[in-house]
Amino acid sequence: MIEQQKRKGPELPLVPVKRQRHELLLGAGSGPGAGQQQATPGALLQAGPPRCSSLQAPIMLLSGHEGEVYCCKFHPNGSTLASAGFDRLILLWNVYGDCGNYATLKGYSGAVMELHYNTDGSMLFSASTDKTVAVWDSETGERVKRLKGHTSFVNSCYPARRGPQLVCTGSDDGTVKLWDIRKKAAIQTFQNTYQVLAVTFNDTSDQIISGGIDNDIKVWDLRQNKLTYTMRGHADSVTGLSLSSEGSYLLSNAMDNTVRVWDVRPFAPKERCVKIFQGNVHNFEKNLLRCSWSPDGSKIAAGSADRSVCVWDTTSRRILYKLPGHAGSINEVAFHPDEPIIISASSDKRLYMGEIQ
């Protein structure tokens, strides 16, 4: 027994080394069971948790903006993404490979505050401080429409998920507007008392939901042309709104340093706030920090002024990730439509794309 133990002793530290070298050979395509042992040779190069996405590396840095980056969104097909900000440019990037910036959309005379792809990804909508909303062909990069009518900064825009291509906008002029991109002027306008910082549609696109500096979230009925109900609870300006993919719940981010989930189904109880999340912060910069849902609704993410990316578990309300790396406020975090990947846009002029388990 003693001799056996002695014999085993020095072998133990050598085993992993041998196995690693063997797998490298298999990864290169030699050996009988090459395909079984190793799917991707690249997975051996990283010394960390196993890879869970098709990104070239677990974290990719996207640099090219010349000013603060306010917004970022993945294309619905997941192969490209768009980002925009203070430099008045919209940059289009490849998600896979070297993440090259393959196109730049120009034409704004003010910062780009928010952007969204429509459901099929054929169009990109963007809102700007030059008081306009632009509609771009996401394939060619051409601007196909410019919507004018607001008298101050347009802080937010959101395209309808289904039906005719409608888009809603919210502005510092205190109005929420509804546009049909086939028409020149807004087809409906709702007058709010204070600046509107964030807007979205409900799932059926017959209501617009808005948030602003009066701390309230308002739901406007497009058929009856009036305010339907108001959701109160935030103690400071609401800077971001996002509807869950199945359309039942609304996520809001506000300067009171809370992120909330609201039940926006018809006939929901009067107290619609169902969850409160804490962990992200706003600061004196008063940037419009946005928020987003993962495609399956199991996670939420929000921008934060403490230079970290916050991702929560929706059910337990636990912070799953507080990711460092940026040198400025994180203004938006977006989830990839298919893979466990997030992208963050920051005031440090950079974007980080990384995989999360």
From Swiss-Prot:
- The record's WD repeats, renumbered to this chain, cover 64-103, 107-146, 149-189, 191-230, 233-272, 283-322, 325-357
| Positions bearing the Glycyl lysine isopeptide (Lys-Gly) (interchain with G-Cter in SUMO2) cross-link | K18, K270
For this protein, the record's InterPro entries field holds: G-protein_beta_WD-40_rep, U5_snRNP_Component, WD40/YVTN_repeat-like_dom_sf, WD40_repeat_CS, WD40_repeat_dom_sf, WD40_rpt
- Pfam families in UniProt: WD40
Sorted UniProt keywords: Isopeptide bond, Methylation, mRNA processing, mRNA splicing, Nucleus, Repeat, Spliceosome, Ubl conjugation, WD repeat
Q: Which GO terms describe its biological process?
A: mRNA processing; RNA splicing
What GO terms are given for molecular function?
RNA binding
Q: Which organism is it from?
A: Pongo abelii (Sumatran orangutan)
Q: What does this protein do?
A: Required for pre-mRNA splicing as component of the activated spliceosome. Component of the U5 small nuclear ribonucleoprotein (snRNP) complex and the U4/U6-U5 tri-snRNP complex, building blocks of the spliceosome. As a component of the minor spliceosome, involved in the splicing of U12-type introns in pre-mRNAs.
Q: What is this protein called?
A: U5 small nuclear ribonucleoprotein 40 kDa protein
